[in-house]
Amino acid sequence: MDVIKKKHWWQSDALKWSVLGLLGLLVGYLVVLMYAQGEYLFAITTLILSSAGLYIFANRKAYAWRYVYPGMAGMGLFVLFPLVCTIAIAFTNYSSTNQLTFERAQEVLLDRSWQAGKTYNFGLYPAGDEWQLALSDGETGKNYLSDAFKFGGEQKLQLKETTAQPEGERANLRVITQNRQALSDITAILPDGNKVMMSSLRQFSGTQPLYTLDGDGTLTNNQSGVKYRPNNQIGFYQSITADGNWGDEKLSPGYTVTTGWKNFTRVFTDEGIQKPFLAIFVWTVVFSLITVFLTVAVGMVLACLVQWEALRGKAVYRVLLILPYAVPSFISILIFKGLFNQSFGEINMMLSALFGVKPAWFSDPTTARTMLIIVNTWLGYPYMMILCMGLLKAIPDDLYEASAMDGAGPFQNFFKITLPLLIKPLTPLMIASFAFNFNNFVLIQLLTNGGPDRLGTTTPAGYTDLLVNYTYRIAFEGGGGQDFGLAAAIATLIFLLVGALAIVNLKATRMKFD
């Protein structure tokens, strides 16, 4: 007799479809909000990932995809999506001066005003639960007073000329500061019809819009009469001369426009960017190669030593040698920064006492790079040592016994047996280590901050900067403004370079071992 297995209430199809339906409605609501805010890329990404997830978990035929979907969704959200955004920004002029859309930049400019009339001193006086606004003309000595009003929203106050002083004590600067936004929304109308608004914490003045938008999209400065047109090549409203050519004046804020390959060509044509970029690229490759070589060499040698059968206290040595890996890297880096201090660091004190020298670790390019390699080797060798310790267990003892019978010594065993058998399984990990050190942002940022700085460059660049640090400084530390478009272009080039180097290394390794 067949046994029908009873389902629990939480396993019912009705509950499943109800939950999926609610999730679908929530996702649809979020997508509509993103689209309404102009975040089209976020809206499309959310729609694709959510729709795929709902389909996979609702369809029995896609059951196997339930195990793959979380990983693929995570990769798409945290790897592919930022990559696409970075590449998209690289083809724009997006920067600290060009962050807004054209419509928003135009709106900001049209909201600006200028003082076009008299300036009046004002006072704020309590009238029970309400307030009265008093204006005084310093030139004529006339005083004006409003009826009692309450703060809240935009409002127009009709003022009357008066000779009597308002009752109550005049509000101090603290009260005016607390109600500054409400006062800014007030338009005071004088008996002659002139309108004045708050221009400072103690004054009202006549204001007019600074710019007027003409029918052809031209902005006219009402104060100077200069005309401006949107220049979509640079993303700014730019002045135009009498003969219709572009002038020198630009209005901020600018707006974001597509610039094509301009940011990429700047990297290779602007000498102020090209020279530091090429020099930093070479240093980045050299730094990564030397670091990988030294960490593997030190880690492999130490792994062989702690695996030596005749060595006593091997467990203690293993723990001590692995300690640098257990300490968070940023703590070790900051400790080394103090140890390498040129004036008070223990390393310079020791070198001065023994050899009479005090290297300029932070001001000389060569010694600064040497310091970086020393610190990075210290941080990286424990990882390689742990890997080699595990791989050494897989080497048969028969090989060493046979070599001993042939009269081979420790060095011959290492170079003829140990190294060839370890290097092949270590190769993928060495490539991964190379890629990691190629983008080792934290080490440079905490230890040297890219210094010492290079002179004569268009963008901020240092002798110890890696490409990723150079990109960061362009994006967030540029003296002439944050240039996100150029930084995104360099980040895209870094991605292509690291990918190309990894492919070349993998192919070279495959050819070698095939």
Curated annotation (Swiss-Prot):
Localisation per UniProt entry: Cell inner membrane
Major location category of this protein: membrane
Entry coiled-coil feature ranges: none
Boundaries of every ABC transmembrane type-1 domain copy: 281-505
Positions on the Cytoplasmic side per record topology: 1-16, 59-66, 307-318, 393-425, 506-514
Swiss-Prot/TrEMBL keywords: Cell inner membrane, Cell membrane, Membrane, Sugar transport, Transmembrane, Transmembrane helix, Transport
GO biological process, one term: maltose transport
GO cellular component, one term: enzyme IIA-maltose transporter complex
Keyword flag Transport: yes
Residue intervals passing through the bilayer: 17-36, 40-58, 67-92, 276-306, 319-336, 370-392, 426-452, 484-505
UniProt topology in membrane: Multi-pass membrane protein
Periplasmic side: 37-39, 93-275, 337-369, 453-483
Effect listed in the UniProt record for changing residue 376 to K/H: No growth on maltose
Effect in UniProt of substituting residue 380 to C/S: No growth on maltose
Xref: CDD domains: TM_PBP2
One Gene Ontology MF term: ABC-type maltose transporter activity
Record's function text: Part of the ABC transporter complex MalEFGK involved in maltose/maltodextrin import. Probably responsible for the translocation of the substrate across the membrane.
Note, other: When MalF EAA loop mutations are made concomitantly with MalG EAA loop mutations, a complete loss of transport and complex formation is observed, except for the Gly-407. This suggests that the MalF-MalG interaction may be important for the proper assembly and also for the correct function of the transporter.
Family as reported in the entry's similarity comment: Belongs to the binding-protein-dependent transport system permease family. MalFG subfamily.
Subunit structure, interactors included: The complex is composed of two ATP-binding proteins (MalK), two transmembrane proteins (MalG and MalF) and a solute-binding protein (MalE). Protein stability and stable complex formation require YidC.
Protein name, per record: Maltose/maltodextrin transport system permease protein MalF
Organism: Escherichia coli (strain K12)
